[in-house]
């Protein structure tokens, strides 16, 4: 019997491979993205201390948009502004094993436009 590969399991393996190579520090924290079917979440993480420095998601009241891609761009804007308040400019982008396309790309480009460098 032919079995279909589990996309989320494949994504998790891809993310684990990438996480072995990248890590966030206090000077250059990691911008992590998690995408569910309904929402998208972004965190700026210092992996050395194990602390989240800034975060945003589509569940926040500041996030506006008519569709999921617009909301993802709004999340990128909000997380970039919250990081800027804590004087964070340089980050390492961790796409979480997702393809750089659609909502993940919209979030990343909005974060770049609002001052984050990666």
From Swiss-Prot:
Q: Where is the composition biased (Basic residues)?
A: 10-20
The record's annotation in InterPro entries points to: Ribosomal_uL18_bac-type, Ribosomal_uL18_bac/euk
Short name of any one Pfam family annotated for the protein: Ribosomal_L18p
- Top-level taxon in the UniProt lineage: Bacteria
Q: Which NCBIfam families match?
A: L18_bact
What this protein is called in its record is: Large ribosomal subunit protein uL18
User: What's the family?
Assistant: Belongs to the universal ribosomal protein uL18 family.
Q: How does it assemble?
A: Part of the 50S ribosomal subunit; part of the 5S rRNA/L5/L18/L25 subcomplex. Contacts the 5S and 23S rRNAs.
Q: Which UniProt keywords apply?
A: Ribonucleoprotein, Ribosomal protein, RNA-binding, rRNA-binding
Q: Record keywords: Transport included?
A: no
| Gene name of the encoded protein | rplR
